[in-house]
């Protein structure tokens, strides 16, 4: 019944057993909790799990793991091995923050620990951080992406995803990037930072597929400040494909409110299932590479239809698989009526991260 959803697909030289993946998700879990969560999702039959926010630098968050050092590599190897043993492939979302980490550390030392206050300082400082970053630091970050990609290969990751939001997306954005050198201004210049990261990774790890998380912002109404405009998508897609990207994971750009990028059930604009697919539609116009769609996806019938109609080649879900890790197994078994459907309340997942409370799902 769901022959397209369950059909294998090849990304670069990597064959995935079906079209369903677990989206990169920050969960604030301890190592053993992460291993258990990812194992449960993998055992249900998803083809790919993308580990979100794999830092290219040491992290100051207690439960965050960096792939920049040996200790972090050993921890990631435990996760990767468990996912492989549970039947799924695994991708590392290489990530770099778009704020001055030292500034945030100093802010916290001054006693400012409120999440809202720190978030405001982070967001308010993005434009200056991007615009004034020295070229030596740009080159250093590009090298860190390359080194971390090599570490990911050594650990056993099957794919690399470049986090094209945050720092990379902010460099791509005409809102945040006001540089007047070769890294700012035109589409060609604003794509340069991402392009050099892609090229450096491709040169270092020639045999691992590169997925690009493509962040697109919307106008009228305005949502998102990082990323590129719909009118700029063609240029960026063709440029990145020419440099060796093997697939695109398409979503709304960040730096709007969290409830916009992870929309709740009562969002005024992103109400419907597949709410970000219109962004994937634009990317599909300009490439034959696999395109992964996201945004309130939960209905097997809906997902089957968008794959069969060539709107996307894959889907990536987070909240639905957190609500019911056996979603895909129930689809395979014809037990769709038994699926615990995500209600998109965000109460124990996205909201829990903001309040630093226990991550989970109200349906558990």
From Swiss-Prot:
Keyword Glycosyltransferase attached: no
Catalytic residues of the enzyme: 166
GO BP term, pick one: porphyrin-containing compound catabolic process
Pathway the protein acts in: Porphyrin-containing compound metabolism; protoheme degradation
InterPro entries: Aldolase_TIM, BilR_N, NADH:flavin_oxidoreductase, OxRdtase_FMN_N
Any one GO molecular-function label of the UniProt entry: FMN binding
Site (Important for catalytic activity, assists active site Arg in protonation of C4) location in chain: 255
Assigned keywords, A-Z: 4Fe-4S, Flavoprotein, FMN, Iron, Iron-sulfur, Metal-binding, Oxidoreductase
Family assignment from sequence similarity: Belongs to the NADH:flavin oxidoreductase/NADH oxidase family.
PANTHER family named in the record: 2,4-DIENOYL-COA REDUCTASE, 2,4-DIENOYL-COA REDUCTASE [(2E)-ENOYL-COA-PRODUCING]
Name assigned to this protein: Bilirubin reductase
Species, as recorded: Clostridioides difficile (strain CD3)
Lineage of the species this protein comes from: Bacteria, Bacillati, Bacillota, Clostridia, Peptostreptococcales
